[in-house]
């Protein structure tokens, strides 16, 4: 989803429609696979700014897989040290397996490293399980 220009506003009510739709899509999702490039040892500022507009109550219990890309292995822990605490704040249900890929792990934007591909497959299975649990809990709450 392209948020378009204008994402840099300070208040949610000032978001232009494309950005407001992005935030609404995040809040209404059954699950999220979130990813960010890593710059200077942290997630991208605009990535964080998008989540500054998200209502924490709408993310509570949402299944999430955490992913990131960066210039090398020295950025790999950003997923655990930055993304996991952010989504912990939202009380999201995060898959235990996260995925980080560097330039040596991809060719033309596709994962080519066997170990990274295996982590991706594991994270997908975990996300499916979290979705199943989320649906059972949701059905119980609706009854």
Predicted regions and their residues:
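Residue-level signature of the cytosolic catalytic core of signaling kinases
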Residues: 15-18, 79, 112
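N-terminal beta1-alpha1-beta2 submodule of the flavodoxin-like/Rossmannoid cofactor-binding fold
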Residues: 1-55, 118-121, 125, 129, ...
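Secondary-structure boundary/capping motif
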Residues: 42-43, 74-75, 108
């Amino acid at each position: 989803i392209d948020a378009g220009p204008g994402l840099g506003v300070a208040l949610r009510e000032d978001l232009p429609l494309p950005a407001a739709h992005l935030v609404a899509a995040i809040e209404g999702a059954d699950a999220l696979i979130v990813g960010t490039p890593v710059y200077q040892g942290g997630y991208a500022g605009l990535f964080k700014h998008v989540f500054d507009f998200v209502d924490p109550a709408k993310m509570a219990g949402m299944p999430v897989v955490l992913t990131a890309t960066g210039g090398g292995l020295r950025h790999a822990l950003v997923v655990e040290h930055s993304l996991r605490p952010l989504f912990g704040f939202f009380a999201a249900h995060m898959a235990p397996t996260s995925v980080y890929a560097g330039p040596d792990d991809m060719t033309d934007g596709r994962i080519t490293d066997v170990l990274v591909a295996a982590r991706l497959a594991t994270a997908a299975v975990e996300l499916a399980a979290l979705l199943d649990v989320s649906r059972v809990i949701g059905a119980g709450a609706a009854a």
